[in-house]
Amino acid sequence: MTDRIELSACTSMMVGKNASIDGSTMISRNEDRFYAIHPKRFFVQPAVHNRHETYVSKYNGLTMPLPEEGYRYTSTPNGDLSDGLNEEDGINEKNVALSATESVYANERVLAYDPLIKNGLAEDSMCSLVLPYINSAREGVKLMGDIVTKYGSAEGNGIQYSDENEVWYQEIVTGHHWVAAKIPDDCYAVAANQVAIENIDFNDPDNYMWSEGIQEFVSGNHLNPSETEWNFRKIFGTDTEKDRHYNTPRVWYAQRYLNPEIKQEPESSDLPFIRKANRKLSVEDVQYVLKSHYNETEYDPLGNGTEEQKTTYRAISLSRTQNSHICQIRNNVPDAVKGVQWLGFGVPTFCPHVPFFTNANDTDETYRELPEKMTLKNAYWLHEALAMIVESHYGAFKQADIDYQKALSEWARTKIAATDKAIENQADAVAFLTAQNHEIATHYNEATTDLLAQLVTEGTQLSKLTFVMDKNL
């Protein structure tokens, strides 16, 4: 069993339907790993019927019977399955989305009374054990909570759920205790490896959910430092020097972009989990946050600050990001095209989020298959190569990369709109959308290959191994 600290350290952003520009709900996350290369695939898991199987985690041995019936769903499993599937994120055929997980850490006080369970539910299993079996975001919270109650939790995890109406965020922080909060429809939320949920209203089950006995657990063990509030973050979370350099600055930067009128400090321990943006948010806004690295501040590792400033805070977009995704459930479109999974391999700063319709029965070979050795015919490796080339001459290549991503974003919107319009005339929507996904993958792969060729050619002129020469020599 790999130590958890080597597994995942992510940034998550959620958007309610009335907070978005088009009525969509959105959940999103950068899946960050300990190593810079941790290959991922994009896959469609088929629906199952009359199954009689037992699930056994390759990561920690969690064992539980599987339901006989399960929905089709998309996922982004690891290339190396030796530590389990780690499917991470996806949308099922009922247009319910899940992203798991945001690693979170409880304090020693609460863990002393409810320690983590070594072979309990962990990140590797969450998507596989919940997404195929839920009809709504709220059902997802309940099913995940029921599994934790029965089998315990091996780790601290934050999980996002969404359907066309609701967005929920659940934090499992000890062996058996958790809470969940519905993101208000007109708000967004950002989480960054730190317990985020704040005050819980136990008289409002429509907007909050929690593990059985959590109030008694807290009061019985004298865990609440406040006499006036029940603040989950302050009871169960951490507030350390590491948090102020690794975690809170990411929330600060996202809120700085989405609410520039509000002045806050990057090391503040009181940044709110939920905010209402100063404008309606688009999928491009979510992409900007996921791609960000303290842009236009002295803390930008690619900027002009001092070396100390550029290394003070951990950025949102990293070379260690393996999979950056946005699960968008759209309203005001036919059910067949509501689910769009924007998937980005490679470093998010330099690479595009590619939109795939999730009502499909297969993914493109360049995303589904993953050769052991690098090849530019594979989407993961292609985008990793692009990121490395762009960063190698960032000043010279930055604008070309920005133009490439902008052109693809424009193309994506046009393609999605055309597909929305065409879907009503399709006898087999799943087959049609599967074909559209192949076209989308091909377009993005070709555009990326073209840019890569352009930058390699231009880069030869930037080599330090050169000299002013006579053109005839």
Swiss-Prot record:
Reaction(s) catalysed by this chain's protein: an L-aminoacyl-L-amino acid + H2O = 2 an L-alpha-amino acid
Catalytic residue list: C10
E.C. designation(s): 3.4.13.19
Annotated InterPro entries: C69_dipept_A-like, Peptidase_C69
Pfam families recorded: Peptidase_C69
Molecular function in Gene Ontology: cysteine-type exopeptidase activity; dipeptidase activity
Domain of life: Bacteria
Gene Ontology BP, a term: proteolysis
Sorted UniProt keywords: Dipeptidase, Hydrolase, Protease
Protein family (similarity comment): Belongs to the peptidase C69 family.
Protein name stated in the entry: Probable dipeptidase
Organism, scientific name: Latilactobacillus sakei
Organismal lineage: Bacteria, Bacillati, Bacillota, Bacilli, Lactobacillales
